[in-house]
C-alpha cells in the first residue's frame, strides 16, 4: 500500500471508530433533516416503521421480518434475483482480470466475498437505523415534494451484545426504503410547505414517537402507500490479503423501482450513473451524450448538481471501489470520458469544456462550481452514485446508521453518518426553511468533497468544511497555477493543506508543521 492510501485508510478507521470530541456541541448539524435518536428508532422499528410492516402490511403478526421471509416475498424476488446476477458478474470479472487472486467466502481468500447465504438466513434482518428527510431532492419530482428515506442496516439477531460496551453484530449492507414525502393520495392541504413546516417544528421539541406520528407530526403522512423504490448498498468484497489490491473494498449499488400495479420491485437505471463502457463503445451514444451535456441549459444544471441524465445513458448497477485517493484513476466511475485520462477515446476535450464555459459567460449564466477542465471532470464523477459514495464516506457508506441495539446505544462510539452527510445538513435545512416560508428553494449543491459556502458560518472549523481532515486544495505559487474550480478549498487557521496525491494538488487539512 502506498503512503497516501495508508494515510487514508488510517483516517477512515479514526472516523469510523469514534465520534469527534465536540459531537455533543454539533447536534444542530443533525437536527431538522434526520432522525437518529436510538430510543426513537428502536420504538419505530418495533412498530409502524419496521420493514415488515411496510413491505408486507397484510401480515397478521408484528414480529420482525427475517431475511428468509423478506426475500421470499413476491415483491422482493426480483431484488434477490438481480443481486444474485450482480454477484455472478462480479466473480466472473474478477476471475478474468485477476486469475491468481483467490475469491470466495471466508478468511482464506485474497478477495473475501459477502456471503449471499445471508439473504435466506432466519437469523439476520434489516433494522431501522435512521430516517432522513430529502426534500432537497424535490427538483427530481416536484409533485412528491422530495423524499423521506428509511435506512435499514443488516444485523444478526442470533448474537445479542455481550458486555457493558458491546455493539450489535451489524453486517456491511444497507437497504434504503425511499418514500415520497407527499403521497399520490394526499389531499390538497398537504403541500410541500406544510411538510417542511412539520419537519422543522420537530426540531424544537424533544423527540417522541407520539409527536412524530401525531396530528401535525412529520411522520403522520408516510406509510406503505408512499413507497417509491428501494436502494441497496453492500460490501460485495474486500481484499485484506491481496498482493495487488491492498485493503481494497468494493461496494455494490443497486436501485429497484416499485411497480404499484404489479406489486413488485423492478431493477431500474441508477440516477446519473453513466454507463461509461457502453457509452464509449457506441458512436451514437457518444455523440448524443456529448451534445446533450454540453447544451447550455444542461451544462448549467450540471454545474449546480441538479442534472438528471436521460436513462438511455445510464447503468442498472455500479461497483464503487474504496479507497480511491485524490488522483484521477480508473477506480473512478467516469475515468476515460475526459481528455488526459489515459485513453484515446475520450469523449470530452479541454476545448469542449472551455467552449462551454465561454458560452455560459456570454449568456450571463453564473456557474458556481465548474471553472476548469478539472472541475468538469470532478463533477462528472460526483454526480454519479458510485462517485458520490467514494467521496468522504465511511467506507462506501454515507449512512451506516445508528446502532440502537448496542448495550449502551446513547454512548455508542459508532458514527451514524459520513462527513459528507453531516456537511450537507445546513444546505438541506435551508431548503426546508425556504419551503416552509413559501420561497423558491435553491437546490444547488457544491462538490461532494466540500459543502457550499451557504453553511460556512455553522461549518467553519469543522471536519465537514475546513477543519482537521477536511478536503482541501493547495494553491500554486502563481495565480495562473491555481485551479479556479477549487481555489476556495482552504484550511482553517492553524491548519495547512497537505497534498495527498501524486498528480493533483488535492489533499487534507492537517496541523501546520514547524
What are these regions (language model features)?
Residues 1-8:
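Bacterial N-terminal signal peptides that target proteins for export
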Residues 8-16:
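Bacterial N-terminal signal peptides
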Residues 19-23:
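Sec/Tat signal peptide C-region and signal peptidase I cleavage site
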Residues 24-358, 420-421, 427-462, 495, ...:
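Conserved small-residue
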Residues 347-371, 464-477:
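Short, charged low-complexity linear segments at domain edges
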Residues 382-392:
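The canonical Cys-X-X-Cys-His
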Residues 392-441:
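Primarily the internal scaffold of c-type cytochrome electron-transfer domains
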Residues 457-514:
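Secreted, cysteine-rich disulfide-bonded mini-domains of extracellular proteins
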Amino acid at each position: 500500500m502506498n503512503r497516501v492510501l495508508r494515510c487514508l485508510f488510517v483516517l477512515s478507521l479514526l472516523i469510523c471508530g469514534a465520534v469527534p470530541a465536540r459531537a455533543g456541541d454539533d447536534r444542530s448539524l443533525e437536527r431538522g433533516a434526520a432522525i437518529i435518536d436510538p430510543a426513537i428508532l428502536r420504538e419505530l422499528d418495533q412498530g409502524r416503521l419496521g420493514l415488515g410492516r411496510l413491505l408486507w402490511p397484510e401480515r397478521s403478526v408484528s414480529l420482525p421480518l427475517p431475511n428468509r421471509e423478506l426475500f421470499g416475498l413476491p415483491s422482493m424476488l426480483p431484488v434477490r434475483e438481480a443481486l444474485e446476477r450482480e454477484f455472478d458478474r462480479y466473480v466472473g470479472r474478477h476471475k478474468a482480470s485477476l486469475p491468481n487472486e483467490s475469491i470466495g467466502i471466508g478468511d482464506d481468500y485474497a478477495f473475501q466475498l459477502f456471503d449471499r447465504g445471508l439473504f435466506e438466513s432466519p437469523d439476520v434482518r434489516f433494522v431501522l437505523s435512521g430516517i432522513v428527510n430529502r426534500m432537497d431532492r424535490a427538483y427530481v419530482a416536484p409533485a412528491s415534494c422530495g423524499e423521506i428515506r428509511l435506512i435499514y442496516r443488516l444485523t444478526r439477531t442470533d448474537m445479542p451484545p455481550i458486555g457493558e460496551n458491546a455493539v450489535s453484530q451489524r453486517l456491511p449492507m444497507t437497504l434504503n426504503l425511499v418514500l415520497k414525502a407527499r403521497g399520490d393520495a394526499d389531499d390538497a392541504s398537504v403541500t410541500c410547505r406544510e411538510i417542511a413546516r412539520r419537519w422543522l417544528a420537530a426540531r424544537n421539541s424533544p423527540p417522541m414517537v407520539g409527536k412524530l406520528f401525531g396530528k401535525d407530526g412529520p411522520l403522520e403522512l408516510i406509510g406503505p402507500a408512499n413507497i417509491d423504490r428501494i436502494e441497496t448498498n453492500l460490501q460485495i468484497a474486500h481484499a485484506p490479503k491481496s498482493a495487488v489490491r491492498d485493503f481494497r473494498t468494493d461496494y455494490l449499488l443497486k436501485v429497484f423501482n416499485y411497480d404499484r400495479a404489479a406489486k413488485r420491485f423492478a431493477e431500474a437505471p441508477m440516477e446519473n450513473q453513466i454507463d461509461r463502457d457502453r457509452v464509449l463503445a457506441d458512436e451514437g451514444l457518444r455523440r448524443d451524450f456529448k451534445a446533450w451535456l454540453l447544451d447550455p441549459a444542461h451544462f448549467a444544471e450540471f454545474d449546480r448538481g441538479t442534472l438528471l441524465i436521460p436513462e438511455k445513458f445510464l447503468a442498472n448497477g455500479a461497483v464503487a471501489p474504496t479507497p480511491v485517493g485524490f488522483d484521477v484513476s480508473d477506480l473512478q466511475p467516469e475515468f476515460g470520458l475526459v481528455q488526459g485520462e489515459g485513453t484515446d477515446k475520450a469523449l470530452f476535450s479541454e476545448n469542449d469544456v472551455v467552449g462551454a464555459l465561454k458560452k455560459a459567460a456570454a449568456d450571463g449564466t453564473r456557474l458556481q462550481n465548474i471553472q476548469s477542465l478539472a472541475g468538469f471532470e470532478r463533477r462528472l464523477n460526483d454526480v454519479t452514485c458510485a462517485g458520490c459514495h467514494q467521496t468522504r464516506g465511511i467506507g462506501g457508506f454515507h449512512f451506516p446508521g445508528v446502532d440502537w441495539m448496542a448495550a449502551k446505544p446513547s454512548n455508542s462510539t459508532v458514527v451514524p453518518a459520513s462527513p459528507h452527510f453531516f456537511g450537507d445538513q445546513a444546505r438541506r435545512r435551508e431548503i426546508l426553511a425556504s419551503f416552509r416560508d413559501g420561497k423558491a428553494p435553491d437546490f444547488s449543491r457544491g462538490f461532494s468533497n466540500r459543502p457550499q459556502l451557504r453553511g460556512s458560518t455553522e461549518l467553519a472549523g469543522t471536519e465537514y468544511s475546513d477543519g482537521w481532515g477536511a478536503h482541501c486544495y493547495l494553491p500554486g505559487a502563481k495565480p495562473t497555477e491555481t485551479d479556479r474550480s477549487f481555489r476556495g478549498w482552504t484550511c482553517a487557521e492553524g491548519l495547512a493543506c497537505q497534498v495527498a496525491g501524486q498528480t493533483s494538488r488535492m489533499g487534507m487539512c492537517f496541523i501546520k508543521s514547524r
